[in-house]
Structure formats: C-alpha cells, structure tokens
A protein has these predicted regions:
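GST-like fold's C-terminal all-alpha helical module
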Residues: 61-66, 70-71, 77
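Compositionally biased, intrinsically disordered low-complexity regions
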Residues: 5, 13, 70, 90-95
Length: 139
C-alpha cells in the first residue's frame, strides 16, 4: 500500500498519507489534488490551475504511472522514502553512539511515506542535490 500511518509534513505543509493500493491513484489524489485543495483553501480557486491539475491527475498520471506500466509484472512496489530530501535536510554529523572525531552523512526532517522508489530522485533534483553529491555517494 502507498501512504503512511501518520500525517507527515513537507516543510510546513501537512501531507495526506491515506493509503491507496495504486501508486498512480496515491500520487494523483494524495499529492496533486490534495495540494490543489490546500492552495484553493488558502488562495481561492484558480480555474486554470484547477483544470491543469485535474487533467494531469486524470490523463497524464495514469499514462505515466498507471498500474501495468511500471515495475514489470509486480508493478510498483512501495518503499519507505524520506519524502523531502534536499540539501537543506542533509548534512554531516556525529551521532551519540559515535566516537569523538567520527562523523557520517545524516538526513533529517522527513516527510516519510511508502511511495515509488524513484519519487525521491525528482525532489532531490528539483531542490538542490547537485552532481557532486552523486559523485561522492554513488561514484
């Protein structure tokens, strides 16, 4: 199931983590349409924006993320992701169990959710993980 047993926040925005059996449905309803609803509540409706979000949720998401399109026979298998992983939520630190002078990469301020395993990559690229991070971590 895609979702999470508790509300988490992405920044200061609560996330609707209600469970869905389909990644496409979770993404369309609990990310795109949920954020549209929050925007309309705060700023009033925007007919053009609403139309674009709904069209994306109804037409684009099923084509790109729909069941049977990704993940082969198994489909998309939900994995726990951080949910808000960007350079401001990552650093180098020392955990209490570590010896003096030791440090390691740490991440914090999660917006955890069971999601598509590649969801995090889009967020990371959009908000500030640069090539140098990948060279140091994956290279």
């Amino acid at each position: 199931m895609f979702g999470f047993p508790a509300t988490t926040c992405c920044g200061d925005t609560p996330q609707d983590n209600s469970y869905e059996g389909s990644w496409a449905k979770f993404y369309a309803e609990h990310r795109l349409r949920f954020i549209l609803g929050r925007s309309e509540k705060s700023n009033g409706p925007d007919k053009e924006l609403g139309g674009l979000v709904n069209r994306t949720a109804d037409e684009v998401v099923p084509r790109l993320l729909g069941d049977g399109h990704l993940g082969g026979e198994k489909g998309v298998v939900p994995v726990v992701i951080h949910g808000d992983l960007w350079s401001g939520n990552a650093g180098v630190g020392r955990l209490p169990s570590m010896k003096e002078g030791e440090s390691e990469d740490v991440v914090f301020d999660p917006s955890a959710v069971y999601a598509h395993n590649e969801f995090e990559l889009g967020i990371m690229k959009m908000v500030g993980f640069e090539r140098e991070h990948w060279d140091g971590t994956c290279g």
